[in-house]
């Protein structure tokens, strides 16, 4: 047992991040039916502004997941019919676009955005994220993914999804280019 004069360490502060998508249905199928749910407003900039204001000061960040394809594997490959009624991350819009508006009405909230090294252009991604970095005063982060959905490849005019090792080799080169483009931006 320690002595009475020992200092009790300060409890560690929690880091809280909200997690959503620019879609009416995220990871909880059917949640869009809850009476208080507002995700049906995902195409309305005031929805994103109100969400950011609600989170600012109480959460450290808002993480916006993204995907470039549709979960089309249930009941056979290429079948999107089961996805639509459940709004299973569908439809989905570009999560980076409302960030500047959200940053303009918040003081401390950070924004994490998913972007794929498989399908993005290093120059265009560096340009977009550098712009967001400046507009948010450094409150933007990148969730780096290589993508995995066959439907994403098809959406982007490829015949098939790249194999795992090929995607990760491309990601390594992609990151080197993006780092160089972002240096000093």
Model-assigned labels for residue ranges:
Residues 1-2, 125:
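Short amphipathic alpha-helical surface micro-motifs
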Residues 2-105:
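N-terminal beta1-alpha1-beta2 module of alpha/beta enzyme domains
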Residues 11-12, 19-21, 26-41, 117-185:
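Flexible, glycine-rich active-site loops centered on histidine and acidic residues
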Residues 58, 107, 136-138:
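Active-site-proximal glycine-rich helix-loop-beta segment
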Residues 59-66, 111-112, 142-145:
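Short beta-strand segments at enzyme active-site cores
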Residues 77, 115-116:
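Short linear capping/connector segments at secondary-structure termini
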Residues 104-113:
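Conserved catalytic cysteine-centered active-site region
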């Amino acid at each position: 047992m320690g002595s009475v004069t020992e200092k009790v360490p300060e409890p560690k502060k929690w880091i809280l991040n909200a997690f959503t998508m620019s879609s009416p249905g995220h990871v909880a199928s059917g949640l869009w039916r809850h009476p208080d749910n507002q995700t049906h407003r995902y195409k309305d900039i005031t929805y994103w502004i109100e969400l950011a204001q609600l989170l600012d000061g109480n959460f450290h960040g808002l993480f916006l997941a993204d995907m470039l394809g549709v979960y089309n594997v249930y009941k056979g490959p290429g079948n999107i019919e089961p996805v639509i009624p459940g709004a299973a991350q569908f439809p989905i819009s570009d999560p980076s676009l409302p960030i500047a508006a959200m940053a303009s009405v918040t003081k401390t909230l950070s924004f994490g955005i998913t972007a794929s090294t498989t399908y993005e252009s290093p120059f265009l991604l560096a340009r977009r994220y550098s712009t967001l970095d400046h507009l948010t005063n450094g409150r933007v982060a990148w969730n780096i993914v290589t993508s995995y959905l066959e439907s994403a490849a098809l959406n982007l005019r490829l015949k098939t999804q790249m194999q795992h090792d090929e995607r990760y080799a491309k990601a390594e080169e992609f990151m080197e280019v993006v780092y160089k483009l972002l240096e000093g931006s």
